[in-house]
């Protein structure tokens, strides 16, 4: 928590000139605390993919937390009917619909917004929402670049709103077990993303579907003709809109690895390399790597390693893990993939784990599931206690930045990069610094503001 406070102060004072003192964590610093008896009206922005989970989560707590999904917003109107039907069936209420998020922000009846848009819309949408006084839940990765994450933090501070991020929360009991010395001094954490990623083909450019407001969908990205293979979901695999699997699945495991190492800071050394293997470029136009290894070192020498392997590969660990984490300590190691188990030294059988009495999770511990983050978000809107957010935007920035820093090294041929985390600049490397933001700039009017 101390490092989080320090980062917020530095980010605000260093780049925005906002004198916040310790107010960022005081309930009295938030002017828009929502009373216990007042219904909280939510707009879910982006309902074609991950947004469906947001609809379900808020519907499940509609009575216990007095929440209503008052609006659904998506630039593709083809998703509206199913989203409205879901809300009707799960909550008994019919939400309004909108394709332009700016109109949602102008609606004074909306208290908070929940973003499940593509990555490249997260920062600008969040900043606009903050400027309108809306609290924000934003999916992982919180940003498309390192600079965007910093601007989001500054906006939350300036407009005194809460921002929760949607990286999978690391299981509280596993993290506490390691923090309390369960496997000794942890010196390395690994993250695994071993998802099969086959060719998705090539199609010629075409007119966008009549249901899609394409200019708004493209937003801050450079203008390009509509192409089905660069649209819904496949935007992940093109640099102007996505961050590859290192920035797609990666933030979940990077987040868990960082938390397990006890790091609320940036690494000081980065190198990442890989490529597109096993796919004929004549049959698939993918730009981001399907195979990538990213290495990070922190100031105290602790290491983080992240592997993306989208072609034929083995699973790892005793659980045959394909999506998860491995932690290595001076007295043993721990496997984490939903559940977890710890091994002493060279022993073959675990001595602690998620289903063992040695480490049972407190049922009140909200860190153990993604769904709990939605309820926690609403709780904080009522209490005003920013420090109670289990997935605070600052942590989301550290986790997302790992993916961004890795991709910067990848773009530069995998070369070693030295990073000054306090300044969020590379050391004597203007070529790398240029990649901390959009290399192509921001397309008007969807421009990231210099001052939020």
Where does each model-flagged region fall?
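Active-site-adjacent bridging/hinge elements
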Residues: 225-234, 370-380
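Core domains of carbohydrate- and sulfate-ester-processing enzymes
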Residues: 190-230, 234, 435-441, 447-448
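Rossmann-like dinucleotide-binding domain that binds NAD(P)(H)
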Residues: 215-302, 312-314, 318, 394, ...
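NAD(P)-dinucleotide binding in Rossmann-like oxidoreductases
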Residues: 284-372, 421
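C-terminal helix-rich "cap/oligomerization" subdomain common to oxidoreductases
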Residues: 10-36, 158, 284-287, 381-452
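N-terminal glycine-/serine-/threonine-rich beta1-alpha1-beta2 phosphate-ribose binding loop
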Residues: 1-135, 147-162, 452
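A contiguous active-site-proximal alpha/beta segment in oxidoreductase catalytic domains
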Residues: 135-137, 142-216
């Amino acid at each position: 928590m101390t490092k989080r406070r320090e980062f917020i102060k530095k980010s605000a004072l260093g780049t925005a000139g906002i004198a916040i003192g310790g107010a960022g964590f005081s309930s009295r610093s938030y002017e828009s605390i929502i009373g216990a008896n007042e219904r909280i009206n939510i707009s879910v922005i982006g309902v074609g993919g991950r947004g469906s989970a947001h609809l379900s989560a808020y519907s499940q707590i509609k009575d216990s937390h007095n929440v209503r999904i008052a609006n659904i917003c998506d630039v593709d109107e083809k998703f509206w009917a199913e989203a409205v039907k879901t809300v009707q069936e799960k909550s008994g209420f019919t939400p309004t619909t909108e394709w332009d998020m700016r109109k949602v922000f102008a609606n004074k009846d909306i208290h908070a917004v929940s973003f499940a848009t593509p990555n490249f819309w997260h920062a600008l949408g969040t900043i606009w929402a903050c400027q309108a006084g809306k609290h924000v839940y934003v999916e992982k990765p919180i940003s498309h670049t390192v600079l965007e994450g910093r601007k989001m933090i500054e906006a939350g501070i300036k407009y005194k709103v809460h921002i929760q991020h949607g990286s999978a929360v690391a299981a509280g009991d596993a993290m506490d077990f390691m923090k309390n010395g369960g496997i000794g001094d942890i010196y390395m954490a690994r993250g695994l993303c071993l998802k099969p990623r086959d060719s998705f083909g090539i199609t010629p450019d075409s007119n966008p579907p009549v249901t899609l407001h394409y200019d708004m969908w493209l937003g801050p990205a450079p203008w390009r003709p509509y192409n089905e293979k660069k649209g819904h979901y496949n935007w992940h695999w093109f640099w102007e809109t996505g961050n590859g699997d290192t920035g797609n699945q990666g933030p979940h495991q990077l987040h868990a690895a960082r938390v397990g190492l006890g790091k609320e800071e940036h690494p000081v050394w980065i190198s990442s390399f890989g490529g597109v293997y096993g796919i004929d470029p004549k049959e698939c136009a993918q730009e981001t790597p399907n195979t990538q290894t990213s290495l990070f070192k922190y100031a105290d020498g602790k290491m983080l390693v992240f592997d993306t392997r989208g072609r034929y590969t083995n699973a790892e660990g005793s659980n045959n893990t394909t999506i998860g984490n491995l932690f290595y300590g001076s007295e043993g190691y721990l496997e984490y993939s939903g559940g977890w188990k710890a091994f002493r030294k060279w022993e073959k059988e675990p001595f602690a784990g998620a289903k063992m009495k040695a480490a049972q999770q407190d049922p009140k511990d909200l860190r153990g599931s993604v769904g709990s983050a939605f309820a926690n978000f609403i709780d904080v809107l009522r209490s005003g206690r920013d420090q109670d957010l289990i997935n605070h935007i600052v942590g989301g920035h550290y986790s997302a930045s790992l993916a961004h820093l890795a991709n910067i090294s990848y773009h530069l041929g995998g070369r070693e990069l030295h990073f000054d985390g306090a300044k969020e600049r590379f050391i004597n490397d203007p070529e790398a610094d240029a990649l901390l933001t959009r290399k192509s700039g921001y397309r008007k009017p969807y421009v990231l503001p210099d001052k939020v």
